[in-house]
Amino acid sequence: MARYIGPKAKLSRREGTDLFLKSARRSLADKCKLDSKPGQHGRTSGARTSDYGNQLREKQKVKRIYGVLERQFRRYFAEADRRKGNTGENLLQLLESRLDNVVYRMGFGSTRAEARQLVSHKAILVNGETLNVPSAQIKSGDIVSVREQSKKQVRIAEALSLAEQSGFPTWVAVDAKKFEGTYKQAPDRADISGDINESLIVELYSR
């Protein structure tokens, strides 16, 4: 399946919640009506959604949040299932540990899509070395920074300033003056923001 390149707000409206696909400079609630589905008058249905439908919708929502395609997502779930502990939490930790997501969480990109672009364009270093693979898994102690030539980009400075005002996640330590951050550890479930019910995804793949 190809990556979706259409209006991002439409995806959030479809799920009825902010998927954080747009910059936080303006509240998404100011940009569109999250309580109505896409379409001229908002699509409605009197039919109750089945358990399978809810599970499938939750998977689609998480894929859209992290910008992951179906084949990648299946691999992440298989790896999460192999690991010890809660499969759903393992899945979210794997997604949160992606390089593009860590760049976003550290505030170098205003959205995950922008962070992914920075990584692909070789604007990001990991432990001092260029790494242009958005899906690369970041480990505890890894240092993620902005390449010297890219520090002049206005969009990075603006995104970082906004992130400083909002506050960084507890599992990363960011030095905004150096355009650098340390990935301290994989986040606990309570540290992962977003309206996600990962148990529905586990149920879907357990069918």
Swiss-Prot record:
GO process terms (BP): ribosomal small subunit biogenesis; translation
Tree of life domain: Bacteria
Domain S4 RNA-binding: 97-160
Family matches, as PROSITE patterns: RIBOSOMAL_S4, S4
Annotated GO CC locations: small ribosomal subunit
Gene3D superfamilies in alphabetical order: Ribosomal Protein S4 Delta 41, Chain A, domain 1, RNA-binding S4 domain
Disordered: annotated segments: 31-54
Entry keyword set: Ribonucleoprotein, Ribosomal protein, RNA-binding, rRNA-binding
Purpose: One of the primary rRNA binding proteins, it binds directly to 16S rRNA where it nucleates assembly of the body of the 30S subunit. With S5 and S12 plays an important role in translational accuracy.
Name of the protein: Small ribosomal subunit protein uS4
Taxonomic lineage: Bacteria, Pseudomonadati, Pseudomonadota, Betaproteobacteria, Burkholderiales
